Amino acid sequence: MANYFNTLNLRQQLAQLGKCRFMARDEFADEAGYLKGKKVVIVGCGAQGLNQGLNMRDSGLDVAYALRKEAIAEKRASWRKATENGFKVGTYEELIPQADLVVNLTPDKQHSAVVQAVQPLMKDGAALGYSHGFNIVEVGEQVRKDITVVMVAPKCPGTEVREEYKRGFGVPTLIAVHPENDPKGEGMAIAKAWAAATGGHRAGVLESSFVAEVKSDLMGEQTILCGMLQAGSLLCFDKLVSEGTDAAYAEKLIQFGWETITEALKQGGITLMMDRLSNPAKLRAYALSEQLKEIMAPLFQKHMDDIISGEFSSGMMADWANDDKKLLNWREETGKTAFENAPQFEGKISEQEYFDHGVLMIAMVKAGVELAFETMVDSGIIEESAYYESLHELPLIANTIARKRLYEMNVVISDTAEYGNYLFANAAVPLLKGKFMDSLQAGDLGKSVAGTAVDNAQLRDVNEAIRNHPIEAVGHKLRGYMTDMKRIAVAG
């Protein structure tokens, strides 16, 4: 199999990278109707598998789970989760031949084996669904021509997909039809019904492509969503402790600081996040973010280039073939860091203190979000896709750190995201550790910015620069569909 994207000519590559249309609410008037009365079989019962299945069943669909024989015989976690929630469970051979839609929600590294196992069992004219297009785009999986291949990609972890549905809402979602596999022209109808069944139509749906979803998803998770949070956590903790800050306080400031800071980002974009600072602190955060963007732009561009070319995917798949040697080593190294092993702080940190004492962290968020967005757009990805894969998902990932530090983030995200996270963080930490971190001033981290003097013209220009960044305009539009967003921060 060959990387699908690399088999396309330049015009085709650009067309698929740039495929992005924000769908109108009335396009989902039939909601999940197209799939009602049909059999949906989900392969895999992890976070996305279970929670999407629960939503689909509550939306009136006939949902069952196909698991490997050994998973059923040994009553593994996937079998227990499916049966405890009242779903029908069977082997591939028992359930796949009956399915109108087979939804593959296993980890990326298992996709080829799963697809090759289920394809011969699928009836003529059935549909195959994904929630991430890595197997189609990067692996280049060939699917039988009578099978329709679609994607519904919620832009949140599986737990959030369920919680938002239970609240009568949903999470923003990308949908796509593989152009090589839509023999009956029903792919979009299937994808729309599946998205509606998970509740995604209530929060906004983008009609995208497998290519655009994969390339933007990989870029977001490697850089701002995971890599920048990991690098920032390690750098900020070590800096605070080296300057005499109590390790427990430093740990709590960082662990819960990302979540508190990005809650403002979620509600009102970079503008609101920066507005939580005093005017002197805002000016300092802006200056630091501009420095960070200049230093890190080549690193962000390298990650985007390696994602576009397939270099990243080929490297990761080589590690799969080597029993995840690099991934497991990086995971072990992260577990040994001082931040991960710091004592817990029993005291209280107020919400505003996280902002006042986290000017550098705010600068890192601003720089990372803007760089990820700009780099994706410069590579042909449409602004709406770039927004969802940078700013939108950041509070959700920050929330995982608030639960159990970097360990929890790396457990919750996919192995693909975790691998890319380590690649980025392992380069970003030494890049920033020396000259930049050594140049920090009192008030950048762990203390409030001193002084009150502000130049009006400078403040005016900085405010205009923040509010006029393209991500703020597209964010304002997309957040209009998410007016019922719940508050997720739990800092204290």
UniProtKB/Swiss-Prot annotation:
EC numbers, comma separated: 1.1.1.86
Active site positions: H132
GO cellular component annotations of the record: cytosol
Keywords assigned: Amino-acid biosynthesis, Branched-chain amino acid biosynthesis, Magnesium, Metal-binding, NADP, Oxidoreductase, Repeat
Enzyme class: oxidoreductase
Lineage: Bacteria, Pseudomonadati, Pseudomonadota, Gammaproteobacteria, Enterobacterales
Span of domain KARI C-terminal knotted: 209-344, 345-485
MF GO annotations: ketol-acid reductoisomerase activity; magnesium ion binding
Primary role: Involved in the biosynthesis of branched-chain amino acids (BCAA). Catalyzes an alkyl-migration followed by a ketol-acid reduction of (S)-2-acetolactate (S2AL) to yield (R)-2,3-dihydroxy-isovalerate. In the isomerase reaction, S2AL is rearranged via a Mg-dependent methyl migration to produce 3-hydroxy-3-methyl-2-ketobutyrate (HMKB). In the reductase reaction, this 2-ketoacid undergoes a metal-dependent reduction by NADPH to yield (R)-2,3-dihydroxy-isovalerate.
Domain KARI N-terminal Rossmann: start-end pairs: 15-208
Protein name: Ketol-acid reductoisomerase (NADP(+))
InterPro entries: 6-PGluconate_DH-like_C_sf, 6PGD_dom2, KARI, KARI_C, KARI_N, NAD(P)-bd_dom_sf
Residue sites binding Mg(2+) 2 per the record: D217, E389, E393
Cofactor note: Binds 2 magnesium ions per subunit.
Reactions it catalyzes: (2R)-2,3-dihydroxy-3-methylbutanoate + NADP(+) = (2S)-2-acetolactate + NADPH + H(+); (2R,3R)-2,3-dihydroxy-3-methylpentanoate + NADP(+) = (S)-2-ethyl-2-hydroxy-3-oxobutanoate + NADPH + H(+)
Gene3D superfamilies in alphabetical order: N-(1-d-carboxylethyl)-l-norvaline Dehydrogenase, domain 2, NAD(P)-binding Rossmann-like Domain
Family: Belongs to the ketol-acid reductoisomerase family.
Gene Ontology BP terms: isoleucine biosynthetic process; L-valine biosynthetic process
Residues bound to Mg(2+) 1: D217, E221
Species: Yersinia enterocolitica serotype O:8 / biotype 1B (strain NCTC 13174 / 8081)
Superkingdom classification of source: Bacteria
Alphabetized Pfam families for the sequence: KARI_C, KARI_N
